[in-house]
Amino acid sequence: MRFDEAYSGKVFIKSHPSFEESEVVIYGMPMDWTVSYRPGSRFGPARIREVSIGLEEYSPYLDRELEEVKYFDAGDIPLPFGNAQRSLDMIEEYVSKLLDAGKFPLGLGGEHLVSWPIFKAMAKKYPDLAIIHMDAHTDLRESYEGEPLSHSTPIRKVCDLIGPENVYSFGIRSGMKEEFEWAKEVGMNLYKFDVLEPLKEVLPKLEGRPVYVTIDIDVLDPAHAPGTGTLEAGGITSKELLDSIVAIANSNINVVGADLVEVAPVYDHSDQTPVAASKFVREMLLGWVK
């Protein structure tokens, strides 16, 4: 990668030219094969990169600049269109290689099922892993219309993998009654409607533990993020999500990886959603990479 490409829109702004010298690797997962309503999130990673050239490199939230963190944008994993299982296998293999290389993986989706193979790779690396999950939806189904590979299932899958007591979901305002009942029955940490205040209460409990953070853009109210596949009224503001990212940055937890998913720019011709997403990525880079 040439230095001038760092401002081209082909990569996330200010991307470092060297994989070897970088602490963080940004990678895209352009998959929306299993969505239940509106496809289009496969175009999210590219558009987040394109609009990132409009970002300031300085964060007034964290008093840091992007040049202080070395991150490499590796582009998108070349996922086979329509083949969900092969796509998930490729994501798990890629993230495992990043972890073996000592990199902080920062993934861009794509539908939320792409987080499932990442969870598996992270759990192998960190046996005491905890998950912070911000979303409008529970994502606790075992299957959707009989299909276990669905974007409505990744949090149920990771609960089964690492134990529901190690999964913390915030901002939840939609799901089947059975999903909410299951979460309560098994002792999962599910916080409805809000993110920031319950997150502040949880963070001290996670100090010293490796934590993976997954953010579904639809945790935001559609007024703040219309470009997503499954809109859900009654969400949080972009400011609350920014404040939550900063709260994590100012805590003593050890964030070991993250993803931001379900940006579907085809439904947002003003680019409001990818512009917000690119700002969230900036704050993750500056706040979570210690």
Curated annotation (Swiss-Prot):
E.C. no: 3.5.3.11
Catalytic activity: agmatine + H2O = urea + putrescine
Record's keyword terms, sorted: Hydrolase, Manganese, Metal-binding, Polyamine biosynthesis, Putrescine biosynthesis, Spermidine biosynthesis
InterPro entries membership: Agmatinase-rel, Ureohydrolase, Ureohydrolase_dom_sf, Ureohydrolase_Mn_BS
GO biological process, alphabetically ordered: putrescine biosynthetic process from arginine, via agmatine; spermidine biosynthetic process
PROSITE patterns recorded: ARGINASE_1 (PS01053), ARGINASE_2 (PS51409)
Signal peptide residues on this chain, from the entry's feature table: none
Function: Catalyzes the formation of putrescine from agmatine.
Residues that bind Mn(2+): 112, 135, 137, 139, 216, 218
Cofactor: Mn(2+)
Underlying gene: speB
Claim: Hydrolase is one of the keywords in the record: yes
The protein's name: Agmatinase
Organism: Bacillus anthracis
Domain of life: Bacteria
Any one Gene Ontology molecular-function term assigned to this protein's record: agmatinase activity
Record pathway: Amine and polyamine biosynthesis; putrescine biosynthesis via agmatine pathway; putrescine from agmatine: step 1/1
Family named by the database record: Belongs to the arginase family. Agmatinase subfamily.
UniProt keyword annotation of Manganese present: yes
